[in-house]
Amino acid sequence: TTKEIALVLKNGPNDGPVNLNCGSDFVQKNQRAPETPSTRLSFVNQRCASVDGDCDRLVYFSIEEGEEEGKEGENSSKKQNFMLCDGDKLSILIAFFLIEQLFLAGLAHKISLGIAHTAYSNGAFTKFCEKNGVETVCAKTGVKNVHKAAEEHFDIGVYFESNGHGTALFSDEAVKVIEKELVDELTRMSVEQHLRKEEEKHIQSVILTTKLKALLTLKATIQTINPAIGDAISSVLLIEGILRKKGNMPFQEWHAMYRDLPTKQTKVKVRDRTVIECFDSERKCLKPEGLQQRIDEILLLDSCVKNNNRRAFVRPSGTEDIVRVYVEASDAETCEKISTKVEEAVIEFCN
């Protein structure tokens, strides 16, 4: 029926060790489709969900096939464009959908909604949120930190780390407001239908039905999403439901909501990672003294004016003596240059 969601399992039980050449982490970090025996099928123009071995992370991807490459008369193949919707785009889709439903339900002024993220969220994501009036809060790396931020700052807090680990949280108060409004709306509809004339009743019921549908959608979302930290299966059901509610929104349209800036992540081996102290949700470095100033200077290299698309930060690993370096810029070449210089600065200041 039209209410069913058809999910086709692409991998099989004999595909080898869990997460080997597959899973959300493989897809996100390598920017390519899974490569297990059972998945050597065409992903072209298909909307695909990829979860990790213990089903707490989720990313979506698709492959768009373009024009054929190669000269006439030679062996040619069609150019393939890999498209990824990571945790940032999961957050965007869910948050924008819920904002729309709150507006239609007349609850936008009663229930606050926002997105919690980490410093690893792409700069294009945060600018897109700002441009569209979506409130965000940045938390320290780690899903427990983002979960806490979403819970503390918003009545409805949406969060997904870039790797697809996350969920949406509805506060007890938000649930009560939605449920009360739903009961009140059903009561009003019942009364209006008995009191109004047939023509007036028809007009009024159209208005009420729009609100009622939004309230029922919010109620269904609460029942679908798992507020525990990471349940990829319930997240798949929510995403599929949203895409369907949005008129079977094409994957390409979702993916094109904004274009990610090129990024690079590296690790630098150091003698003692604890010499680095960070603040501003790990986006700035407090110690060792002078390192943050050097990073700021590097970001301005080869640029007459400050480039707002350039960003870099360093943070110590939580488990080993390495420093993690994150760099973001308008193009991959600039990313490489900045990353190399930041790595050199880390070695200079931390060894």
Q: Which residue ranges define each predicted feature?
A:
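Phosphate-binding chemistry for phosphorylated carbohydrates and sugar-nucleotides
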Residues: T1-K246
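Catalytic-core signal marking the mid-to-C-terminal active-site face
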Residues: E198-T221, I242-N351
